[in-house]
């Protein structure tokens, strides 16, 4: 009887068991991890991304419409996100 119960549990929860085991592999290959040293900075009123992977220069931060993000108080905006600490791109991407 116990073997039948174990078999039924496995049949009904097979995908959950697979997801549980596969989740640890997915965390190791997290694509956001490559952006841990990347941070946001302001140059005038424009928002820039620095320390991008495979790049040493500042890259303009782009909105969904591919236009550069320009905000009147760019530095105040960044300070509102993370206080006096530098704002990493990881802080923004993992915010829920």
Swiss-Prot record:
One Pfam family in the UniProt entry: Pox_L5
Record-given protein name: MF6 protein
Species name: Myxoma virus (strain Uriarra) (MYXV)
Lineage of the organism: Viruses, Varidnaviria, Bamfordvirae, Nucleocytoviricota, Pokkesviricetes
């Amino acid at each position: 009887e116990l073997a039948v119960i174990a078999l039924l549990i496995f049949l009904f929860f097979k995908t959950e068991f697979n997801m549980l085991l596969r989740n640890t592999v997915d965390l190791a290959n997290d694509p956001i991890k490559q952006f841990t040293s990347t941070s946001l900075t302001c140059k005038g009123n424009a928002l820039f991304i620095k320390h991008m992977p495979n790049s040493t220069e500042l890259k303009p931060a782009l909105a969904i419409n591919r236009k550069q993000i320009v905000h009147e108080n760019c530095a105040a905006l960044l300070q509102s996100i993370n206080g006096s600490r530098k704002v990493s791109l990881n802080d923004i991407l993992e915010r829920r």
